[in-house]
């Protein structure tokens, strides 16, 4: 097999041109086989095989650098840089990351995981190169989805201003190029990338600039775009920004891609290559259902059906159901997502109430301020977003929502440890970054019924509130404990005295396990479902001091600025002396891996917490 010849970076350059297509097919089959076992981002990687091969053939890595936006489409890059064996443990505990990691390989130029960052990072590397007097090529690869994020345009605007050599590749997998459109696109691409065109353009501009008043003439020429040119030549939006546009280019034609990359290296200033690819290319189920195979669980190759289909509802399913009920009950309820209607569970709401559903693209900042405007206009907006992505809209939460005390509900999915996507996606900071904002309220449900109750409470609150819930199966235990939700009030599940286990959200289930372990050791333990992180139930905390010897706080959030620190502050403010143990996530980023294994690693499983308690007694 040709793929067996790829053992390290630049081995691809030893492959004969006539074998490029065969190698691409082998890479696709390798990816399908491996990801069917481990799970991972399949669709985007199948679509980027030829593009990645072309980049490795046209560039001199690692001196030249590639920055992958989001980074989930970097699997072929990992294969071509000698990491084939890592796919056996892809995204597994202590295994290979599913994203670029500088600590994993010198060929990974920049860590990514969130969208729309690659152009900014690439431009920074470009200016570092210039300041050091180097002549390397820097390429940022960004998808059409990521180009909906405002940061990408901020970076493009800056790139045009800096007038330094920089290549941006737009990997557009929104649609395939049909035969008719393909012919026209190829014709226009040949004109735009022809050496003569580039030489003529540069020659004219240089000649004019050498004359008195030439700069003004050049600027007027650049602004003078005829209506015909606007209609006929694609990419004029980028050209008007001062970024040279090349394309559209067939993203599955390796030699054509190499040619346009070589031409882009000749362009003075920033250049954008528009590449058209097909998401899921080469695997029928992924071509037919690209969204399903964006982030795939292990699946049967022949059918594409998940190997272990879910049989019980997860928290996203519960949220989806209650959203539809809320929408039916109140016509003022509107739903907002940042390009994730499926992942956040809003697809059903969208189908039922299309006029009250808003997908704003990968634009979390806009999503939050848009929600603030809706709230100011009398609506009841619910922003459904992953915890790690809400970080991108911190100023909007503070400035646009909370200062005005607007009733925006933040439904925070993937809160806590999420597992295989690693550091960039762990939702372990939201208690901390939200709790310091005046007017913000934060709560977390212990089980699926409480999530439904909290969402109903949140919509009725008339103030900013975040409801955070984890990834995975919705806990169905403790069904008999369903006291009405009251602002800032905890729920006593069991009161025995001895050790008071104050647990937040997903940690209530763990508290049950800790209590059982303590019983085995002869200790009594109470379980308190904290419910609210802000405001905390100070009355419950002080009450626990009366008949308990120790307070233990349990949270799936970093300890710094979290629930435990708020409990300690309460005790200090009221001059209460009692032994305390805080169980949470340490001051460190948590890598990828199975959530249960990660909890053991950081001491957040029931056994580790129990041992910590016993040491303190």
Predicted region positions:
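N-terminal amphipathic, basic-rich helices that act as targeting or association modules
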Residues: 1-80, 239, 243-258, 267, ...
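Non-catalytic terminal/interface segments that mediate subunit docking, oligomerization
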Residues: 65, 277-390, 396-406, 463, ...
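Structural signature of the thiamine diphosphate
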Residues: 217-285, 407-412, 431-480, 606-617
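Cofactor-binding active-site loop characterized by glycine-rich and histidine/acidic residues
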Residues: 41-162, 315, 332-333, 337-338, ...
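Peripheral docking tails and interdomain loops at the edges
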Residues: 298, 302, 306-311, 419-421, ...
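Glycine-/acidic-rich phosphate or pyrophosphate-binding loops and their flanking alpha/beta elements
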Residues: 259-262, 294-295, 304, 314-329, ...
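A glycine-rich helix N-cap at a beta->alpha junction
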Residues: 86-96, 161-175, 196, 402-414
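Long, well-ordered, tryptophan-enriched scaffold segments
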Residues: 3, 174-319
